[in-house]
Amino acid sequence: MDSEPSSGTSVSTTASSTTTTTITTSSSRMQQPQISVYSGSDRHAVQVIQQALHRPPSSAAQYLQQMYAAQQQHLMLHTAALQQQHLSSSQLQSLAAVQASLSSGRPSTSPTGSVTQQSSMSQTSILSASPAPAQLMNRSQTSSSTSGSITQQTMLLGSTSPTLTASQAQMYLRAQMLIFTPATTVAAVQSDIPVVSSSPSPSCQSAAAQVQNLTLRSQKLGVLSSSQNGSPKSAGQTQSLTICHNKTTVTSSKISQRDPSPESKKGGSPGLESRSTAVTRTSSIHQLIAPASYSPIQPHSLIKHQQIPLHSPPPKVSHHQLLLQQQQQQIQPITLQSPSQDPPPSQHCIPLPNHGLSPAPSNAQPQHCSPVQSHPPPLTVSPNQAQSAQQSVVVSPPPPHSPSQSPTIIIHPQALIQPHPLVSSALQTGPNLQQAAADQVQSTAQLNLPSHLPLPASPVVHIGPVQQSALVSPGQQMVSPTSHQQYSALQSSPIPIATPPQMSASPPAQLPPLPLQSMQSLQVQPEILSQGQVLVQNALVSEEELPAAEALVQLPFQTLPPPQTVAVNLQVQPPAPVDPPVVYQVEDVCEEEMPEESDECARMDRTPPPPTLSPAAVTVGRGEDLTSEHPLLEQVELPAVASVSASVIKSPSDPTHASAPAPPLLIPAASTRSSSTSLASSTPSLENKPPQAIVKPQILTHVIEGFVIQEGLEPFPVSRSSLLIEQPVKKRPLLDNQVVNSVCVQPELQNNTKHADNSSDTEIEDMMAEETLEEMDSELLKCEFCGKMGYPNEFLRSKRFCTMSCAKRYNVSCSKKFALSRWNRKPDNQSLGHRGRRPSGPEGAAREHILRQLPITYPSAEEDVASHEDPVPSAMTTRLRRQSERERERELRDVRIRKMPENSDLLPVAQTEPSIWTVDDVWAFIHSLPGCQDVADEFRAQEIDGQALLLLKEDHLMSAMNMKLGPALKICARINSLKDS
């Protein structure tokens, strides 16, 4: 078993890495075209990338190195197996040479020569289509040197060839390649993880993981899948795909037709495996026809591939086809590994599918590995299938293909993946059945797969219908595939229906191991989970088995979650009517059961055996197939069930039902680690459009002038959140209502008036209300003006007035009150001040006057200042003026007291109003002013009485009396003070 898995792993690694049948044919042969294809810049890029890869700075690099060692071992085994299969792949070699020349090949070590050629082929496909990076990735994964060179190429090329290693290459791919082929990158990442897990041995796992990564990437281009069949075949197929997708598809189908007979005949021989590989590469149809032991699986993958091309536009179709093929190839390599360990969850799928074709386990496995890789590995390996499902998801992302078909294709690869687990049991039990299925695949790919695989059969059938026409007439079908033709083919093939029983028989065996992780995390269709879960578990088991590969896988897995977003990409596919290809005999059952079964998938209640067929088909077709063609959908659904990833892809195709199956697809592909993530992302897909939502999360990584820019999972919000905008608005009415309810005194009219009076104040109040919502209930405030009761949040900052109008009115009323009190007080103040001047001695009187008048004067000054606010204008008097005036009056009185002992006469006059003063009173007043004794006589000479004194100005004094400006100003100031008093 171990030797078989390892050989199978190596084969799968070779297939996935070269996948160009270079390994199958001869690494040297592939290398030559690659070298010829490679340009100086490419070589330099490879060197640079290799240097970067061999750097141990990151754990990813260490994992890559481990993966490289494992891959080299796998390549050695693969090379031996592929050489044995050289005869079968000889047909493709011519094509491979052409493809190598067309595609930019890259020199690499002999073991990685095939890988290199595939990378060159993948490059060609990249040039022709965005998926090329996937091919490069697959090849780079095949061998450490190849992966290093591929990685370098991808680095230099940018998004075209982003492959460093299973983990590193994926990371780089994401960073650099996602820009150009986001879906491809994701698919590659996803496939990487499944491959590792599916590989029975660590080295095999790492190789498988790398192969799967490469396969995913190459699948994106489709070149990889073709090249995987055989170095020549894959090259030819890749070329055809790259050159013209429609033509490529036709060529692939033709090649597969050529090879199918030998392959089916050689069910247990390397030649058969290589042919199966060739078939896979040549075209999905051919895979269905050619594979004898795992031909059902391969045919299924082929069918899927063809479905994609058929439904999708010819160019895009070929691209998708390549992607699907590569995905399936990735899955198949895993299957090859699993065959020996069909019972174990990790490997059970791999050995059986491979052995189904070739009884000899060790011999067949290596061979199968390469064919498996060459043709989509979905059927070949259950773990790989899980990964393949992921890859399928990636493939499905290319929506250019007919919406339903492309999803169907994606699902089919996954279905193939899961079918392989089922097939592993079924194949082991009856390899002849598989061979017969392979033959049937030739006649009817759909039937072939079903007979070969209980569950896979239905997925195969799905593909078969889509690709059946292609299988029958590979060239024509691929060139001019029609979903209806595929549909008829599917329906015509009775095996699909029969397959469910087989599936029920074999899936349960596989399902038990798989369900544990896949089913639980996947909650997808039980059948899909049974196979898909088995794949997932296989991947997990393989990871456990392979420490280095596991580490690598883990890295990819961690990176993979974004690839699982690829499942979302599948949503792009949803338009592709792959579902019609899915046309399944189970159609009737599936259509009716589709909603329920897809729900079952989500519930994980689905029964693995018979339900698998219908539930899988249901889930897959539910969203996509239902829309396009229920029969096909159901068949596709079965594949989807088989591989959760596929179902996810399907769900993108058929938004309506795809959502339910989609989550399962994602989970198996992601494996346990990513399964939870996939579930989260895929659950939304249970509803038709959610898968599209999954696509959006794809993280696009751009490398611009050396800067790696990753796009966020979500766009930055352009407008403010509706929550932010609406909440304050809701709060305000709430606050206002609370205030109105709590404040009974304040009627609504008053509230409205208040707001009208000062809108800014109300805004402030509202803001304060929001800020002090907690305080509102604690205390109530009373307005000092209107007496209204209210919460503090509705009062002004001072918390004294409820509104600004109340504050203003309060100020006006206060100023009026002050003015009235001041006017009422003034006569008393003055009389008091004058009366207090009656001391017996002149000095004592002055002293008394100051002491008495100051306390009274200051308050009056304050009142005057307050009166400035009064609407009525009044003369402004400053404190200094009043003090100076009082001083003058005091001095004048002192003088008069001195001159006139009888001041009793003057005092009454001084106490009277200035307007009634006589000339003598004015003289006495002026004489009392400081420094004005000399001018007092002038006033008398001018006969200025009290009234004239009040009318005097500085000019009068200066002109009429020739007074200096200083004394004139002082006198005028005193006169003004008299006026004010």
UniProtKB/Swiss-Prot annotation:
Residues 256-266 have a biased composition (Basic and acidic residues). GO terms for cellular component: nucleoplasm; nucleus; PcG protein complex; PRC1 complex. It is found in: Nucleus. A motif (HD1) lies at residues 689-718. Residues 917-981 form the SAM domain. SMART domains: SAM. Residues 224-255, 360-373 have a biased composition (Polar residues). Gene3D superfamilies: 3.30.60.160, Transcription Factor, Ets-1 (1.10.150.50). GO terms for molecular function: DNA binding; zinc ion binding. Keywords: Developmental protein, DNA-binding, Isopeptide bond, Metal-binding, Nucleus, Phosphoprotein, Ubl conjugation, Zinc, Zinc-finger. Ubiquitous expression. Zn(2+) binds at C783, C786, C802, C806. InterPro entries: PcG_chromatin_remod_factors, SAM, SAM/pointed_sf, Znf_FCS, Znf_FCS_sf. There is a cross-link at K689, K730, K808 (Glycyl lysine isopeptide (Lys-Gly) (interchain with G-Cter in SUMO2)). The modification Phosphothreonine is found at T607, T612. Residues 1-33, 102-127, 224-280, 307-407, 650-690, 825-844, 863-888 are annotated as: Disordered. Component of a PRC1-like complex. This is Polyhomeotic-like protein 3. It comes from Mus musculus (Mouse). The gene is Phc3.
